[in-house]
Design a protein with these regions (language model features):
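TRNA-recognition modules of translation machinery and tRNA-sensing kinases, especially anticodon-binding
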Residues: 1-230
Length: 230
């Protein structure tokens, strides 16, 4: 007998009912706000993610399912949905502003644990081509409405990571800070100082927490225009 692949799951009975219920709620909610659903391919070019996520990111270096097809092209099973939506927009609707929703399977080679799989579903909404505050508020409101419709106990936190230039300056400051304190960081975080600095802030490793708590704040590196918009 051949077993299912490690890190995957079968949806049947109550599980598939819950899945279809969540998907239906999601699609109806975002459609009511003008988001158009796009069905994306599970297979993408590897370069799409090395360029968007970063070739040194943990997803690219450790988690992507990648292979070479018979034509010699480097392909991957998509690890997340945002890059695929942006690829679709730039390929077919580049000069327009559009609102997209997506719901589909993603793949990451991680250690399977409770409620965490190597093949999993991700839902998302992307707003491309507009900078006005109203659109941001609408996206936040639609997300709140969707989660609320599932009767979940959740807390909505709103953040800003600034502009590209502001973020670049902040990452530079963070690198210097973490490099100065690397003797007190976990091995995993030390490895991310150069390649994926911001991800250190997500660490739950006990020895990292105090260093992270004292790290510089991005709010100190935002321009007045960004702060006012936020």
């Amino acid at each position: 007998m051949i077993d299912q692949v490690k890190g995957t799951r079968n949806l049947y009975g109550k599980d598939i009912d819950n899945y279809l219920h969540i998907k239906d709620k999601f699609l109806n909610c975002y459609a009511s706000y003008g988001y158009k659903f796009v069905e994306l391919p599970n297979i993408e070019h590897k370069d799409l993610f090395t360029k968007s996520i970063g070739e040194n990111s943990e997803i690219v270096t450790k988690q992507m399912y990648e292979f070479e097809d018979k034509a010699g092209r480097s392909l991957v099973l998509r690890p997340e949905g945002t890059a695929s939506v942006v690829r679709y927009h730039n390929e077919f609707h580049k000069d327009q502003s559009n609102k997209y929703s997506y719901f589909g399977k993603m793949y990451r080679y991680e250690n399977p644990q409770k409620n965490r799989y190597r093949e999993f579903h991700q839902a998302g909404a992307e707003l491309i081509g507009t900078l006005d505050n109203y659109s941001d508020v609408q996206l936040i409101k639609s997300s709140f409405r969707f989660l609320n419709s599932l009767e979940l106990n959740f807390k909505l936190k709103i953040n800003t990571i600034g502009s590209v230039d502001e973020r670049k300056e902040y990452v530079s400051v963070l690198k210097k800070y973490f490099d100065k304190n690397k003797k007190d960081l976990s091995k995993e975080s030390v490895e991310k100082i150069e390649s994926n600095t911001l991800r250190i802030l997500d660490s739950n490793v006990q020895e990292d927490l105090q260093i992270i708590d004292l790290a510089p704040l991005i709010t100190n590196y935002l321009e007045d225009e960004t702060i006012q918009k936020y």
